[in-house]
């Protein structure tokens, strides 16, 4: 049903392409199989959560999908609800997202699923902050640049609450070149 509906939408000119969100590799395989059998428009993008703390699906499960179907990724939560910005390294600041939405089960669930806000996670982020400081950039910029260095990531969905955060996020495009192979190895050794 989904394949037929999306095929109709694209062929009718209501959309140029279609994609999926949080589908498993098996579901993507099935969708492409149906599309090819029925000569329907295939999905071109998947929207998974992806960040330094949540990597398994993007880096392992989807590996056969990228080349086989030419799919890209539009990832969400590249900063894992702000944890990868470094702002929680010394506790939860007053007025921060985790302070304001501490009773939000969905937000808490996403954080817990990616390792949680605990000392082990915070120690990793503190090490990332040290790398960022050595590069002369913000921790959030390094975390975003790391996501964008993945050749399968077409774009990252960002959420900001302040204009300065948006500016810093845009500046990430200049930071990406600072993540040399050696820096990437150092980061990956922290978050493996």
Where are these regions (language model features)?
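Beta/alpha (TIM)-barrel catalytic core signal, keyed to glycine-rich beta->alpha loops juxtaposed to Asp/Glu
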Residues: 1-192
